[in-house]
Curated annotation (Swiss-Prot):
Annotated compartments: Cell membrane
PANTHER family associated with the record: FACILITATED TREHALOSE TRANSPORTER TRET1-1-RELATED, PTHR48021
Predominant cellular place of this UniProt entry's protein: membrane
Phosphoserine: modified positions: 254-256, 326, 328, 851-852
UniProt GO cellular component terms: plasma membrane
Polar residues bias spans: 47-59, 114-129, 177-187, 336-347
Segments on the Cytoplasmic side according to the record's topology features: 1-398, 468-479, 525-530, 580-642, 701-706, 768-773, 829-863
Name of the molecule in the record: Facilitated trehalose transporter Tret1
Residue stretches spanning the membrane: 399-419, 447-467, 480-500, 504-524, 531-551, 559-579, 643-663, 680-700, 707-727, 747-767, 774-794, 808-828
Glycan-linked positions: 434
Pfam family, one: Sugar_tr
GO molecular function terms noted in the UniProt entry: sugar transmembrane transporter activity; trehalose transmembrane transporter activity
Length: 863
């Protein structure tokens, strides 16, 4: 202390000597503070520290504006920030004196009174005599001028800042952070954005995320920052239909309720809702470029064209329930699904039909809207419940290549139908000794009719390995030439053995074709029309039956066989034009060929990658679960259910007595003593069979499989019991001449009922419900079982009539149909509108109960 005091005592007389080191130190302090401020992101506004006013400046080193400084930063001494800086040891080495602090001026500070720490420092310096303080002008009494000055500097572009610099000269050093002009401009522009700009920006953004989290984030942003109903009114239909401004305007401008509904349907079809804004943007661009003053027919065509644009396909977005970030996400999905189910876009067509009627949408555009708007459906993969935001394909459903494939294989079914009906008209002329060079006994005639089902049994067994190793298409193609040979053997026969050989070869081909045709169509046709196009083989089969009945009226058995030999020729030619099924290519590891087949079937502009990946996933699951022994796979518990359903449907189909009726139609009418010619009756039955199949083709994708099976069962039960009653009355000697029309009427209703349901649906469902890994072998077993039942019924029908009478045979068939009704009610699933993968997951028991998002039921909907 003594040394320090001595230095201070000498300072009074030698002020200039001590003033020079202090001035030099203050200059260094100024430079270091300036450098430190620049390093921290501040820039110097003004500094005028000189040797003449060091006393004035040292006690006022405070920032001019406190706000640019970070308020939450901890207060640190200059020594702590800059260890090399010792401003208070310039004149005295005072160890117990606190260093000079430097901190922002806070709002709670008293401007007129320096901080306590500075007062202590001043007192220490005064007592030492080393520093003489010069009073400053009084500081401002509040912080408002500083705030006003800061705002004015932003508005006037720096003019106020220059004036502030001039006013600060000679007083203090201050630092401030550069203003972020870009953020202010962004905020101002954000405030000026209109709702339309936000919506267009949302739709036009190129980097739209396919990840559901990104999509939900975008949607939440729109819903949080804009009026929801405004957004929905401009983009799509609101949940509250009458509350939507757009629809309110439509309602006001419409002259009638019918016009309002029409306008609303067009609006929904064109501006359809999509989680991918790119789809909506594409449609907007097309709409803006199209003419608005076209006639009604042109508008309708434009509406359909927009909906069916192949390039507007979007890939599914998989949403795992556990990934939903909040309840609002789930509420959004729930509300969206409620809206969509009310707007008649359910995957269940029966439900859709009821909703169409409720909403007065009818059948004109109902299907188009249902296929244009996305929906949320339940899927399950690897046991984990998921939701799939799925938009059904906007490809044109009836693509000509797909129809060509269905027609090509259906021509094979026409050959099958002709072969099945051949015995009914042919046996009449074959047993006539005047028209045949060889004798055909009744026993041989029964074998002519019964050997074909027996050969079909062998063909069904052999067809399973064929379609697995040769492929579906190649197996079908391989039956064409043997069909021709079989008919030539019959036509050129000189004895019964040649006829039986020809019938056996034809039956073998029939068994293979019956197995492979539904499998091919089930694997190539889209789910939306699989029912309609899947019934084409049955329809063409009935055409073959009708053709055989009509031609048999005018031709003998030999000429009829020559006609049958010409039918496989167009079938053979068309089969060369169509590809193998993509599913079979995938099972053989030929991915590129599968992609080409899908492009051929779905159209060149279609996006086939999602479907191809689904096929590959399904095949991978099948490969993981497959064993070396395919027949042992059939006995697995998970496979027994679909196999037993298929076998049950085949059993009730044949035990309904249909083939007995078809094979022996003429003889039945002769035994009934009908006043109508037997050949005419067969033609009538064939026409009804043909017409009923086309009715089923129209209804099957609207009413569903099970509804048609119910109708079919009831119709067959009633007619078989009535027909049995007629034959019972005839056998007891009662006069039935007044009701000679009854057998034909019963046969017509019976054929109508059979062709609506139990005729085509068992074959269709065989290609739908059997799992992919056992489809070939299981279809082989089901087909063989079907032909076994056919053989038993046709071969034993005459014996049944001899034992229990015609009435007993028909009553037995009716009782079996009655049991079959309960089998359908309790055991057969509905497969309408479902993909093969969905059906397989359900049949294998992989689908678990979902949350309310997936299981929600449609609410009541009122306009």
């Amino acid at each position: 202390m003594s040394g320090r005091d001595n230095r201070g005592a000498g300072g009074g007389g030698g002020g200039g000597h001590h003033h020079q080191p202090l001035s030099s130190a203050m200059g260094k302090l100024k430079e270091k503070l300036t450098r430190a401020g620049e390093e921290l992101g501040y820039h110097r506004v003004e500094s005028n520290l000189s040797a003449s006013n060091t006393g004035t400046s040292l006690d006022t080193i405070l920032p001019e504006d406190p706000f640019p400084f970070p308020q939450a930063a901890p207060q640190r001494h200059p020594q702590q920030q800059f260890p090399h800086l010792h401003p208070l040891r310039l004149l005295h080495d005072v160890d117990d004196e606190p260093p000079l602090s430097f901190r922002p001026l806070l709002e709670d500070d008293d401007i007129n009174e320096p901080p306590q720490q500075i007062q202590q420092q001043r007192s220490a310096l005064r007592s030492s005599g080393s520093l003489e303080l010069t009073p400053l002008p009084p500081p401002p009494t509040s912080l408002e001028p500083h705030r006003d000055r800061q705002q004015r500097s932003i508005v006037t572009g720096g003019e106020e800042l220059q004036r502030s610099k001039q006013s600060l000269k000679g007083s203090r050093v201050s630092f401030e952070k550069p203003q972020q002009q870009g953020n202010n401009k962004a905020a101002e522009s954000s405030d000026e954005d209109s709702f339309e700009d936000k919506r267009i920006g949302f739709q036009q953004q190129k980097a739209t995320s396919v990840d559901h989290k990104g999509i939900l984030k975008d949607l939440r942003h729109i819903l949080a920052n804009d009026n929801r109903r405004q957004f929905q009114a401009k983009k799509h239909v609101s949940l509250d239909i009458k509350g939507t401004r757009f629809l309110q305007d439509l309602l006001k401008d419409s002259s009638s309720e019918e016009e309002f509904h029409k306008t609303r349907r067009e609006f929904q079809g064109r501006k359809h809702q999509s989680l991918d804004p790119r789809v909506t943007f594409k449609l907007d661009k097309v709409l803006q470029g199209s003419s608005t003053d076209s006639d009604e027919e042109g508008d309708d065509a434009e509406h359909k064209r927009l909906i069916h644009r192949p390039k507007d396909i979007t890939k599914p977005v998989i949403i795992d329930l556990k990934d939903l970030e909040s309840e609002s996400d789930e509420d959004f999905l729930t509300s969206r699904q409620n809206f969509q189910q009310q707007r008649s876009i359910s995957t269940d067509s029966r439900k859709s039909r009821r909703l169409y009627e409720m909403d007065e949408m009818g059948n004109k555009r109902g299907d188009n809207i249902r296929h244009a708007v996305p929906f949320v459906r339940q899927i399950t993969e690897d046991g984990k419940p998921k939701l799939e935001v799925y938009r059904p394909t906007t490809n044109p459903i009836y693509i000509w290549t797909q129809v060509l494939a269905a027609l090509s294989v259906s021509l094979g079914s026409l050959v099958v139908g002709f072969a099945s009906a051949y015995t009914s008209p042919a046996l009449v002329s074959m047993t006539n000794t005047n028209l045949t060079s060889f004798v055909v006994t009744p026993q041989a005639a029964s074998w002519v009719g019964g050997i074909m089902p027996l050969a079909g049994l062998a063909g069904g067994i052999a067809g399973g390995p064929f379609i697995e190793y040769l492929g579906r298409r190649n197996t079908i193609l391989a039956t064409a030439v043997p069909f021709i040979i079989s008919w030539l053997l019959i036509a050129c026969a000189v004895n019964v053995v040649m006829v039986l050989c020809g019938r056996f070869l034809a039956g073998f081909c029939v068994g293979i074709a019956s197995l492979s045709l539904p499998v091919y169509l089930g694997e190539t046709v889209q789910p939306e029309v699989r029912g309609t196009l899947g019934l084409l083989p049955t329809a063409f089969g009935n055409i073959g039956i009708l053709l055989c009945f009509v031609a048999g009226t005018y031709m003998d058995w030999s000429m009829l066989a020559f006609l049958g030999g010409t039918l496989p020729v167009p079938f053979l030619i068309l089969m060369f034009l169509i590809p193998e099924t993509p599913r079979w290519y995938v099972s053989r590891g030929r991915e590129e060929r599968a992609r080409k087949a899908l492009v051929w079937l779905r159209g060149k502009e279609a996006d086939v990658e999602p479907e191809l990946k689904g096929l590959m996933r399904s095949q991978a699951d099948a490969d993981r679960q497959a064993t070396q022994n395919t027949m042992l796979e059939l006995l697995k518990r998970s496979n027994l259910k679909p196999l037993s359903i298929s076998l049950g449907l085949m059993f009730f189909q044949q035990l309904s007595g249909i083939n007995a009726v078809i094979f022996y139609t003429v003889q039945i009418f002769q035994d009934a003593g009908s006043t109508i010619d037997g050949n005419v009756c067969t033609i009538i039955v064939g026409v009804v069979n043909f017409m009923a199949t086309f009715i089923a083709t129209v209804l099957i994708d609207r009413a569903g499989r099970k509804i048609l099976l119910y109708v079919s069962n009831v119709a067959m039960i009633l007619t078989l019991f009535v027909l049995g009653g007629f034959f019972y009355c005839k056998s007891t000697g009662m006069d039935t001449s007044n009701v000679g029309w009854l057998p034909l009427s019963c046969f017509v209703v019976y054929i109508l009922g059979f062709s609506l349901g139990f005729g085509p649906i068992p074959w269709l469902m065989m290609g739908e419900i059997l799992p992919a890994k056992i489809r070939g072998s299981a279809a082989s077993v089901a087909t063989a079982f079907n032909w076994s039942c056919t053989f038993v019924v046709t071969k034993s029908f005459q014996d049944m009539i001899d034992v229990m009478g015609a009435h007993g045979a028909f009553w037995m068939f009716g009782a079996i149909c009655f049991v079959g009704l309960f089998f359908v009610i309790f055991y057969v699933p509905e497969t309408q509108g479902k993909t093969l993968e969905d059906i397989e997951r359900k049949m294998m028991g992989r689908v678990r109960r979902m949350s309310s998002v997936a299981n929600i039921k449609p609410l009541s909907f009122n306009m």
